[in-house]
């Protein structure tokens, strides 16, 4: 069998949000029995069929890089972590739906990975300084995933999901909310599975079919500009 082409997707978010459990579920379609803290970075692989069911279908390796640590780490730690950000093709931003702080920190995680967390003055950009325009021209595909959906009380679910919808909109990304202990949330044919497949297709298209991806990106940007004008 010929070697498969591959893409690199970072999985970023605060410690304890369930990144390792999510990656295990994505790669093995199984619940991770005994999750532990990730030190440094852990890499797992998912096999993905690009444009499945079409004449263009082709199989790729999706490398999922689960990066550990805290977004508020010292500069020396962040510099070490920056090694993992080289040659990235996509980013999955993971937050705990029961922890609002983990959602807010996604702004800082994304800016750090995209080398935009430091202003020309050297001052750290906080999520309070976040400007949606910073991502308007971002060409790295993003996906926002909220975990621990099962732990949100029914009385608060609408409030939480409304807030996370705005979060995904800020990143110009689709969102998936799930419980990592229940594989049915990513069952084949489900809306979540479709979103996930669409995200991986975007990552592959950006990496291996850039001209096609660029035309779609520019069309999408033009559409957003027209919506803002009206």
Curated annotation (Swiss-Prot):
One of its GO terms (biological process) is regulation of protein lipidation. InterPro entries: P-loop_NTPase (IPR027417), Sigma_54_int_dom_ATP-bd_1 (IPR025662). It comes from the Eukaryota. Signal peptide: none annotated. Pfam families: Roc (PF08477). One of its GO terms (molecular function) is protein homodimerization activity. Homodimer. Required for KRAS signaling regulation and modulation of cell proliferation. Regulator of KRAS prenylation, and probably prenylation of other small GTPases. Required for lymphocyte development and function. Not required for myeloid cell development. Belongs to the small GTPase superfamily. Rab family. This is Rab-like protein 3. It comes from Gallus gallus. The lineage of its organism: Eukaryota, Metazoa, Chordata, Craniata, Vertebrata. The gene is RABL3.
């Amino acid at each position: 069998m010929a070697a498969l082409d591959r893409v690199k997707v970072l999985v970023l978010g605060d410690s304890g949000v369930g990144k390792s459990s999510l990656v295990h579920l994505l790669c093995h379609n199984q619940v991770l029995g005994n999750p532990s803290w990730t030190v440094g970075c852990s890499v797992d692989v998912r096999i993905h069929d690009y444009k499945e069911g079409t004449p263009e279908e082709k199989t790729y390796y999706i490398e999922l890089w689960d990066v550990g640590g805290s977004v508020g780490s010292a500069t020396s730690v962040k510099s070490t972590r920056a090694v993992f950000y080289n040659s990235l093709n996509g980013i999955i931003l993971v937050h705990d739906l029961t922890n609002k702080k983990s959602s807010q920190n996604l702004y800082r995680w994304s800016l750090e990975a995209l080398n935009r967390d430091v202003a020309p003055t050297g001052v750290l950009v906080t999520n309070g300084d976040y400007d949606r325009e910073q991502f308007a021209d971002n060409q790295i595909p993003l996906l926002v995933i909220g975990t621990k959906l099962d732990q949100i009380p029914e009385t608060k679910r609408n409030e939480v999901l409304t807030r996370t919808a705005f979060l995904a909109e800020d990143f110009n990304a689709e969102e998936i909310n799930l419980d990592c202990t229940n594989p049915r949330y990513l069952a084949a044919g489900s809306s979540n599975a479709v979103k996930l497949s669409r995200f991986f297709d975007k990552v592959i298209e950006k990496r291996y079919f850039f001209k096609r991806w660029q035309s779609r990106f520019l069309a999408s940007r033009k559409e957003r500009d027209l919506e803002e004008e009206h």
